[in-house]
């Protein structure tokens, strides 16, 4: 992330404090916005469970696993819980100096094999093919 922030400042002139990052999933209507420390705090109307990659059992905070997003705010489909192919770590809110006390999510990678294409990857491939 830090190299991205340096690149954005060098190429675009955008300071790190002016960069706002979001995390979300197409099937989950909640956006996780970063705080001034660039942590994705979990809003009050959502929950995040980190699950063991092999057993899908919930893990305690601080351990990496699959990101499971939960919210009752879904209106279009009867889906309350979405398991992603993202790897993440859930941290206690008091570990962040920004002042927000809700837990925050750190994305550390993906588990999807390279031959599986997500919606975003498919869209990127189409856009590249258009030479835009």
Set out the residue ranges of the language-model regions.
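Active-site glycine/GP-rich loop and adjacent strand/helix microenvironment
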Residues: 1-132
């Amino acid at each position: 992330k830090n190299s991205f922030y340096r690149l954005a400042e060098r190429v675009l002139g955008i300071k790190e404090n002016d960069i706002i990052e979001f995390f979300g999933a197409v099937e989950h209507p909640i956006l996780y916005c970063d705080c001034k420390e660039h942590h994705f705090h979990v809003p009050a109307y959502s929950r995040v469970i980190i699950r063991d990659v092999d057993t899908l059992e919930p893990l305690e905070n601080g351990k990496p696993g699959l990101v499971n997003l939960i919210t009752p705010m879904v209106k279009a489909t009867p889906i309350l819980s979405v398991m992603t192919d993202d790897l993440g770590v859930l941290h206690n809110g008091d570990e962040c100096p920004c002042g927000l006390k809700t837990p925050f999510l750190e994305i550390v990678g993906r588990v999807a094999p390279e031959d599986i294409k997500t919606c975003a990857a498919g869209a990127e491939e189409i856009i590249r093919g258009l030479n835009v």
